[in-house]
Amino acid sequence: MNFIEHIDNIVKSYGISNYNIQKFRSVYKINSKDRILLIKKFNSKTKLFNTKKIINHLKYNNFKYIQNIYYNLKNEFYFEFKNKFYACFSWVDGREVNIKNVKEIKKCTKTIYLFHESIKNVNDFSMILKDNSDWIEKFEEDIFNLYDIKNKLTKVNSLSELDKFYYENIDKAILKISEIINILNENNFNKFLSENKIICHSSLYYQNFILGKNDKIYLIDFGGISLNNRVYDLARFARRVFYKNSFDTKVLNDIYKVYNKYYKFSEFEKTLFDSYLRNPYKFVKLGYRFYIQNKNIDELKLLNKLKKYCKYELNL
């Protein structure tokens, strides 16, 4: 059986015989006379089951703007094909949000708050969740990788323009990350974490916010949920919006103020938000991909990217 035949079998198991199929990113839109479905692929059963459970918890806690997961005529909700897993969801009639639109950014921020509030008291031990809440460990790993890259570059006989630029800025990046670690340690971050750990979405990209025809923001794709704290989710979203808006600090203030309107941040949480955004994330990530993972990346394009991000990341 090929993939198309497999999809056809899935659709027919829902009592649908005549339909059109379109691919959008990593999902398939099934359009029939009676209804529209979405078929999504999952690389692991864990992500699939976590998604189902988190949707159930959100609905129970009155978080309305999410997709439904559908069972077929045999009361099955997922299907396996070549070690991949597929499930059917309701189709949200709308479009991806525009993260250069201030009004839509604010709507997304409120949706993030509502998601956190709906999920903050969930303790479902049947869910297998990645715990990536140890910021200090992650930042220390970044420093280790930067030293590794620095050591490699010191052994290169003839440095390229890219090599020189990266080498000249490594110490500055290490210093910034070290300062963040010091702030976390001085404020007893581990104690804070033990008291404030919740389930986070962890994938708050603009394509996971759908602006419905009813002008409501729908949150989708819960396959990447993890354990962290609410500042983590918000700061990661803010960073993505910030980078897409040419490093306009006003959008950071807008995001913080909207969330803070509903949930009053403590002084330390404000410090966490600011610290996360001071992390030279792109400098570390791009360097790691090129120098440690040995990804085949055009050096000139990479150099231009690094220069663009470093204007902000290494000069705060």
Give the location of each predicted region.
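Short, solvent-exposed loop/turn elements at beta->coil junctions and helix N-caps
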Residues: 25-27, 72-77, 189-190
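Active-site activation/catalytic loop segments of kinase-like enzymes and analogous catalytic loops
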Residues: 231-264, 277-296
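ATP/Mg2+ or Mg2+-diphosphate-binding catalytic cores
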Residues: 147, 283-316
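Active-site acidic catalytic loop and adjacent metal/ATP-binding pocket
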Residues: 29-31, 69, 181-230
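ATP-binding pocket architecture of kinase catalytic cores
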Residues: 35-127
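ATP-binding glycine-rich phosphate-binding loop
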Residues: 9-32
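ATP-dependent phospho-/nucleotidyl transfer catalytic cores
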Residues: 20-21, 42-45, 97, 126-199, ...
